[in-house]
Structure formats: C-alpha cells, structure tokens
Amino acid sequence: MAQPTAVRLFTSESVTEGHPDKICDAISDTILDALLEKDPQSRVAVETVVTTGIVHVVGEVRTSAYVEIPQLVRNKLIEIGFNSSEVGFDGRTCGVSVSIGEQSQEIADGVDNSDEARTNGDVEEDDRAGAGDQGLMFGYATNETEEYMPLPIALAHRLSRRLTQVRKEGIVPHLRPDGKTQVTFAYDAQDRPSHLDTVVISTQHDPEVDRAWLETQLREHVIDWVIKDAGIEDLATGEITVLINPSGSFILGGPMGDAGLTGRKIIVDTYGGMARHGGGAFSGKDPSKVDRSAAYAMRWVAKNIVAAGLADRAEVQVAYAIGRAKPVGLYVETFDTNKEGLSDEQIQAAVLEVFDLRPAAIIRELDLLRPIYADTAAYGHFGRTDLDLPWEAIDRVDELRAALKLA
C-alpha cells in the first residue's frame, strides 16, 4: 500500500537501561532514592561516570542518612544485566570509586532561607524555600497519543522497553544489555502523524548471533509486538524501512564500548526533540533542584492544559533565580491549536491561578520527597504507561476550565 504524502518527517530516539549513559543515570537515581528513603530532606547532587572496568561516583550531599554506595552501584549493574566479563562489564568485580562532599553552605542557605524571607522577614511558609539554582524548564503535552506524548518518542520508548523485556525474559536469546531504538514518523498538513516511516534498532548481542536471524526475531518479538500493543496498526500499513544493527555486529557494548555519564540523554528523557529543553538534567538530583522538580511540574501543567481541551498541544516554560521562591517567568505556547476561542495569554493567566509554582509547593503537591526516581532513569520521565508518576496526574482540568469560565 502506498504511503500518504508526508509534509515532514520527525524522528526521536530512545536507549535501553544498558546504554552507558543510562547506567549512570540509574546509579545516580538509585543513590538518591536510597538517601531519600532514610532521610526525605536529603539534598543530593550525584554524578556517575562509567568506563572500562570502573565506576566513579562524585557529587555533593547533605543528609543524616548513611548508605553503602559501592553496594548500591554493584546491585544496579547486576540488575541491568552487567554480571559477567563476557558481556563487557561485571558489577561484582568492577572497581567503584566514590568522591562525595558536603553541599555548599551558600547553596543550602539560599534554599533553606529564600531571598524573599531574608528581605521581607514574615512570609508564607512556601516563600521560605528558594530555588536550588537559576534556570529555565519546559513542559509539553500533545493529544496525539493517549499518554499525551509525541508519538515518535512514545514508540521509541516502547521499543526500548520491549527490547529489554525480550532480553531479560529470554524471549529472544543471545541479547546483551546495551541498545538503542529510533523511530521516524511522517506528519501531514494538519501536523498529525500519518504513518510510520522508519524504525532503527541497534542491540548488543553475543558473538555467535546471525544478523539475519536477529532481524527476524526483533521484527516479530519487538517491532510487530510493540505496534500492536500501542494500537497503531493503522499507521503501519504501508512499507516501513526497518534497520536492525545497520552498522553490522554489536558485540562490544556497555561501558567497555563507550564511557557513560549522568545527564547526557536529556532529549531521550523528555520529549524526543518535539519540545524545547532548558538544558538541565534530572538524574541524581533531589527535588530542591528545579531542573528536576520544575520540569516535572511543567509537564503536569501542560498535560492538564491539553486534557482540559484548551489546546491540542501545549508547551510551558518557567524560570527561576537561585534562592528565590517565586518564578521569574512563565510562558504558555499552544502553537495555534488553542480551543474555545482562548488566547495563550488567557491560558497562562489560568495556569497562574490554578498552579502554585514555588519550589516548596511543587514538592508538596507532587509529593516528591520519596524514593520514586530510579524507575524513571531509563525509558523516559514522562508519559510512562508502566509507572504511576504524580506529575502525570490529570487532576486540575476542572479548575483550569473554571478559571477560564468554561462549562
């Protein structure tokens, strides 16, 4: 069947939990969760580096808790699947170095005693906690999928999750932990997905694997399975370009193939390039860092805007100054998809009325002082169909519509 004419092609990628950068994200968030579990007020900024045979954990922490970081690192590596020198990395025998210092007192003072509190004295409790850094954060939502995510990144994540599942469950034998997926969709003149154009999967594997066999297995157990599970068969009826390990063999992977670092997959973590990004990474950071908590809040805001029927797509930007509680800026963009005769400025005013975007309020409303972060380290922080994440709640729809005087 001939494919519909495409106005544009858009591509997003995902990676598996065995990718070197994702190993680092997982280790950093595992340490964060362990500290929050024992001391919810922990301040954590932990970065991880992995390379051949060794893991380096560095950063700054303020906490009353003690956790055995080397053991946490080893357990996470083994859980991911790096449990033997044959696969290129062994969590049981690799080196682990830890260099963690105390959080800067100046940063701590700015978070614990905001500029508003120092200047005005008697302020609301939520005005006392300042942002942990300056910066800008974006949130995005679209109604092109049930999870309010862009279809390219949503499908790329589903493919990565399934690739890991078939490896761990032995559905497709001889796979190793490292892997990447990439999806290209055609979009029509109405800027809606019209058909699936290209799927790329690169997966680490054992030396004896035949490439033709691997392609057959991954087409059946990963690509076809995901297309059916996602319910997008109508977008996959034409000729789809499928590329499995297009570089050839992929035996050497994980930290032996490439060094990894926390925070290097920020587009994979968010919207696959469909929305703007403020530049701040998430993993290893406690929610006093607005890089993380405010980005989650912006997703919450954007998703509720779209779920309320105010727009088909929404992108929301917020900005903070270090040590200040109140945001210094908020911006709503609906890309001319706004409904009900509303302007972006009206939607923005409703957001300010309905959502409290001070860091302390975000942390309280989303209940962020909990060990919920390690599960987000791979396969995206937004639109997760396999996790119950508080920033994915559609719980302000009625309030937004009421603020805009809509029935």
Curated annotation (Swiss-Prot):
Entry's cofactor comment: Binds 2 divalent ions per subunit. Binds 1 potassium ion per subunit.
Cofactor: Mg(2+); K(+)
Segments of this protein annotated with the region Disordered: 107-134
Keyword line: ATP-binding, Cytoplasm, Magnesium, Metal-binding, Nucleotide-binding, One-carbon metabolism, Potassium, Transferase
Binding-site residues, Mg(2+): 21
Annotated GO biological process: one-carbon metabolic process; S-adenosylmethionine biosynthetic process
InterPro entries: ADOMET_SYNTHASE_CS (IPR022631), S-AdoMet_synt_C (IPR022630), S-AdoMet_synt_central (IPR022629), S-AdoMet_synt_N (IPR022628), S-AdoMet_synthetase (IPR002133), S-AdoMet_synthetase_sfam (IPR022636)
Catalytic activity as recorded in UniProt: L-methionine + ATP + H2O = S-adenosyl-L-methionine + phosphate + diphosphate
GO molecular function annotations of the record: ATP binding; magnesium ion binding; methionine adenosyltransferase activity
Binding site for L-methionine: 60, 103, 258, 289
Highest taxon above the source species: Bacteria
Pathway it works in: Amino-acid biosynthesis; S-adenosyl-L-methionine biosynthesis; S-adenosyl-L-methionine from L-methionine: step 1/1
Region (Flexible loop): 103-113
One GO cellular component term: cytoplasm
Coiled-coil zones: none
Cellular compartment(s): Cytoplasm
Binding site for K(+): 47
EC number from the UniProt entry: 2.5.1.6
Pfam families membership: S-AdoMet_synt_C, S-AdoMet_synt_M, S-AdoMet_synt_N
Binding site for ATP: 19, 178-180, 258, 264-265, 281, 285
Function per UniProt: Catalyzes the formation of S-adenosylmethionine (AdoMet) from methionine and ATP. The overall synthetic reaction is composed of two sequential steps, AdoMet formation and the subsequent tripolyphosphate hydrolysis which occurs prior to release of AdoMet from the enzyme.
Subunit structure: Homotetramer; dimer of dimers.
Family: Belongs to the AdoMet synthase family.
NCBIfam families according to UniProt: metK
Identification of the protein by name: S-adenosylmethionine synthase
